[in-house]
Structure formats: C-alpha cells, structure tokens
Amino acid sequence: MSMKKVFFLITAVFFISGHLLLFLIGQYYLNIEFFYLIIIGFFVLSASASWLMAWEDNYLFRFIYFISGIWVGVILNSLFLFLIFYFLNLQQYIDNLAFWFFICQIPILIFEFLSAYLIRVRKIEVRIKDLPDYWDNKKIVHACDLHLGPVWRLSFYEKLVKKINKLQASAVFITGDLFDGMEADFSWLNINSFKIKATEGVYYSLGNHDEMLGSKTVNELLGANGIKVLENDMLEKNGLQIIGLNSFHHLKYDIEATIIKQLSYSSSKPSILMLHEPVSLAKIQSLGIDLQLSGHTHGGQMFPNNLINKILYLGHDFGLFKKGDFHLNVSSGAGTWGPPLRLFSRSEIVEITLRKK
C-alpha cells in the first residue's frame, strides 16, 4: 500500500472518530440541541480542505485549511477539557456548562498557537568517543518536521533560517518532513537571503511526508539551496561519518544490510546517523553508531498524542537518550502537522555541542 493511501486511511479514521467523540460530548454531556448540525458542517469543511488545496493553492483555500486545522484542535481540546470537567465533577457547580466549556477553548487555543509559532532553541551536549579534534567543541544544529505547505509558509521558513544561522553552527542536520507533502509553489526557497548557512554543510534525510511530495522534487528544491540530500547514503567530513537513511515509511529495508553492505561505514570511526523515525534503536546501537538524530513524533504535538507516542516509541518520543556510547536525540520539530497548535510540546530546533569523550 502506498504512503498516500496509508496517510488517507489514518486521516479518515482520525477525522471520523474525532467528530463522533465530539458529538457524544456535545450531545450527551453538554446537552447542546442540534449539535449534530455543527458537527456535520465542520466535518464537511475539514474533509474538503485538503481537496481544495490540492485543486488550487490560493488565499481562500489556505484560510479554509487553517480553520479546519483549528477545528481539529478544538476536537482534541474537547477531549482534554471533558476529562477535566468530568473528573472534577464541574457540571454540578457550573451553570450553562456548554458556554464555559467552549469559552475555555479560547485561551487554550491562543497558548497552543504560540507554542507552535514561537520556535525555541534546545541546547544539549553529546560526548563522542574518538571524535576528531576538528569537531571537538563544534556546534551542530538538528532540525526537522517544519511541514512547509498550506499553513507554514515563507515568513515562517525565513524565521527558521534566521534562527539557525544566528547559531553559527558548523553543520546543520535536517531529519525529514521539511515539506508537508502537498504540491505547492516553493520557488521562494531559491531566495539567497533565506539559505541556511553552515561551514561544513547542510544535510537532509527523507521523511514520510517527503514521499508524498516526491523525492525527486525534494532533491531539486533542496539541491538548489545547497542542501545535500542523503538517500541511504554516507559521506565523511573531516573524519566524521554522516549517514542519511530514508524514512521507514518511505522504504522498508534492513538497516544493517544498508549501512554495512551498501555503504563504506566503519564502526571504528565516529558517526552521525540521520533517520526520520526513532526506531530500530537496539540494532543501530549494535552497529556502533555514536549519535542518531530523529524527529517524526512532534513530541506528541497535542494531547492525547503525547501519551500515545510514549507507548508507540517505548518512551523514546522526545529528548536526548544515552546508552553506552550510543546517543539518540529526538526533536519535537520546528513546525506542525494538521492543527497549527501544540499542547504539552514546543516547536524547536536543537543546538548540539560535540565534545570528545
């Protein structure tokens, strides 16, 4: 089954179940009359938003897409608020429960949008065995999951580039999903003032959304901006092996066979692996990889996805993890997918200081 079909099925299940859940909350907990009409209206709006954007990229359709994203946020927030209201038994103390239930959404939505829009810099330090003197005390940047498309566009990308360039990193590693997967005009990426600058290069590995846009298109867009795309490939830079593997969604493959047999990888040399998802950690550690950079999880982005991610990725859904000489950094990403909102997560890039162990 192709990535587009999988994406469609997951989105359809989420939309239908989410709207059904909101209907049950509104109809039987908040006792809102004719609530099903509101649900049907927004369901049609949300379902049509992606189709409209695929048909034509214009201001009106982007606005509809944005509103549908906010509506998805309202659905997720409704589950969060319902749990709070229900377990605190607030229905016994509040008159006009439905009014206050949805009034509470306003400050939450504002907070969530700011958490998504304002990109923080998370700073960490990684000690690597036998790190070449050249890289000792050098700073690199890890970015991922910007999801440029209908919502996050030119101004947001410009802000990200300025924030990265301000850090004056020696190298920048982007672990996939710079694009949202929808076809759009990205000609503005060729503006020189918006190019990411790093003395030792900017490197990219494909994410699952990159397959929907097409690896050829991604290569053309990024190549024109001096970004090196590593598709199951490796290069060595001043004694440091830099490996980029395709997303597991993009292509199922054996990691050991790919790294050991196809590439000139040496476990005796220090290495950085770019892999979109934080998966196959035990296998990667056994290969002697020093630092794996991943994203994809968005740090959960919104409740209850943060709890689901912790289960799916066995706790390796966000942050820096260390086991022996192996390090894993999972970033929550610089952008969002679906709702342009974040709850219990932040948009970020990661500044990593490399030190010799």
Where are these regions (language model features)?
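Soluble catalytic domains of enzymes that build or remodel membrane lipids, polysaccharides, and related
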Residues: 131-357
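Conserved beta-strand positions that form and line the central face of beta-propeller blades
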Residues: 70, 125, 320
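N-terminal signal-anchor transmembrane helix
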Residues: 60-67, 89-144, 149-167
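Non-catalytic terminal accessory segments
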Residues: 1-119
